[in-house]
């Protein structure tokens, strides 16, 4: 079958033929319709330090997808041939304390689809049936293909009560923009997003944020004053991994504020801990999606009117995958869809 593989320990992704995956007793086989390129895939393409330490070569990559169930293992219940599915990219062990306690998103033995085992940039994908999620009929293939990153956004945004709150989102990548849209949709008052990438700030404006602030041109405290904010932000969502952005977020949080941290900063990042301690801030680390509460919330948010379509900016045939990676690497895109049909 056709697949995109990290074939060599150098920059790039290559299209090759690989054998179809084998179906286990508890697995489903999915014929891929559409995939989306994740920032993780760009890291793997670039072959940065993280990728060199993490990715075995060769490896079929990718973990954002939608497809159709075409084969079912003999032990599988609850799925049938023809079901339209996406899937949770974190495969958990099932036997650690968190898994047995129902907190599978905190499994200490997680294996990543397209990172530690073969991914979805292929004509067929096999995953445990536990990881598959049926897509409601009124959600399009394109939206279903971005459920994985949308789940990061939903998990981060819904970490805290948002109704009537003022929210700061630092980092206007696709996940940050989707998180901001979720905050606004569920009843936050002011939702402000910051970045230095004007293309993506304009995407955020299309998604309905209160203010999209280019911090290289505007002062965030001036924006807060314009909005009539007399105190700091109640909720902060750090999506950028940029030390300067995180420090600004801490500086502008209200006392008792709550911070969800999804962006991965450098290991040696220094912050002013006085901002955390004397403000009584609560900081929560976020990884992945809650299984499967986040997934159900994703579906119902879209069904209740949340419009994510502006975040999908480019579409390519899988044969033109290089164009997709080039536009993702440029930073001048939202989500990029690769069509396998």
Curated annotation (Swiss-Prot):
Its cofactor is Zn(2+). The active site is at 40 (charge relay system), 43 (charge relay system). It is an enzyme of class 1 (oxidoreductase). Zn(2+) 2 binds at residues 93, 96, 99, 107. Binds 2 Zn(2+) ions per subunit. Pfam families: ADH_N, ADH_zinc_N. It is found in: Cytoplasm. The keyword Transmembrane helix does not apply. It catalyses: L-threonine + NAD(+) = (2S)-2-amino-3-oxobutanoate + NADH + H(+). Its EC number is 1.1.1.103. One of its GO terms (biological process) is L-threonine catabolic process to glycine. The record marks 148 as: Important for catalytic activity for the proton relay mechanism but does not participate directly in the coordination of zinc atom. One of its GO terms (molecular function) is L-threonine 3-dehydrogenase activity. This is L-threonine 3-dehydrogenase. Zn(2+) 1 binds at residues 38, 63-64. NAD(+) binds at residues 175, 195, 200, 262-264, 286-287. Pathway: Amino-acid degradation; L-threonine degradation via oxydo-reductase pathway; glycine from L-threonine: step 1/2. Catalyzes the NAD(+)-dependent oxidation of L-threonine to 2-amino-3-ketobutyrate. Homotetramer. Belongs to the zinc-containing alcohol dehydrogenase family. Keywords: Cytoplasm, Metal-binding, NAD, Oxidoreductase, Zinc. GO terms for cellular component: cytoplasm. PROSITE patterns: ADH_ZINC. The keyword NAD applies.
């Amino acid at each position: 079958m056709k697949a995109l593989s990290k074939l060599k320990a150098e920059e790039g992704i290559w299209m090759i033929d690989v054998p179809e995956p084998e179906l286990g007793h508890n697995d489903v086989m999915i014929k891929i319709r559409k995939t989306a390129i994740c920032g993780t895939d760009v890291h793997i393409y670039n072959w940065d330090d993280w990728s060199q330490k993490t990715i075995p070569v060769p490896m079929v990559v990718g973990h954002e997808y939608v497809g159709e169930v075409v084969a079912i293992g003999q032990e599988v219940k609850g799925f049938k041939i023809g079901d339209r599915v996406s899937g949770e990219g974190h495969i958990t062990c099932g036997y650690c304390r968190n898994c047995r306690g129902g907190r599978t998103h905190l499994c200490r033995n997680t294996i990543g689809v397209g990172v530690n085992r073969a991914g979805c940039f292929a004509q067929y994908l096999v995953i445990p049936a536990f990881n598959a999620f049926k897509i409601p009929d009124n959600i399009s293939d394109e939206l279903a293909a971005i459920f994985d990153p949308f789940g990061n956004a939903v998990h981060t945004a819904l970490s805290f009560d948002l109704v009537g709150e003022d929210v700061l989102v630092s980092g206007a990548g696709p996940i940050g923009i989707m998180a901001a849209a979720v905050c606004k949709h569920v009843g936050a008052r002011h939702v402000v997003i910051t970045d230095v990438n004007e293309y993506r700030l304009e995407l955020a404006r299309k998604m309905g944020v209160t203010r999209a602030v280019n911090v290289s041109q505007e002062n965030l405290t001036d924006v807060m004053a314009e909005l009539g904010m007399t105190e700091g932000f109640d909720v902060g969502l750090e999506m950028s991994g940029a030390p300067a952005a995180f420090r600004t977020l801490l500086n502008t949080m209200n006392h008792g504020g709550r911070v969800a941290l999804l962006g991965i900063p450098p290991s040696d990042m220094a912050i002013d801990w006085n901002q955390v301690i004397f403000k009584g801030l609560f900081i929560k680390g976020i990884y992945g999606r809650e299984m499967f509460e986040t997934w159900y919330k994703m579906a119902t948010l879209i069904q209740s009117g949340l419009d994510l379509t502006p975040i999908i900016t480019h579409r390519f045939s899988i044969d033109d995958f290089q164009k997709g990676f080039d536009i993702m690497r440029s930073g001048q895109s939202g989500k990029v869809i690769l069509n396998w049909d």
